[in-house]
């Protein structure tokens, strides 16, 4: 049986620990559970708030339960805008994310953005 979770070499991670989301953007990232296998983060970005640049070292499952219009900033200065999910959209929105390099998120909405991120360690 194939492993559905792609492997990632932790030794190849190019960013320092100081840029980890919990350290670099502690106002929007709170650890709910951490062990040798997973780290579960609560992500809360208030309206009008822009997080500091940070990283997520491990691939993860993201569950967005309160959507908001956000702007995603990449390290190279490129931005991407994402609208708030429609009122009739099914929430939570669940997706797979690979490890994320240096980035920041800005909440450009009047509601707080809220998500749970389950990071898979050692992958």
Regions found by a protein language model. Name each.
Residues 56-78:
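Glycine- and acidic-residue-biased ligand/ion/polar-headgroup-sensing regions
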Residues 1-42, 50-53, 72, 79-102, ...:
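A short, N-terminal "cap"/entry segment at the start of jelly-roll beta-barrel domains
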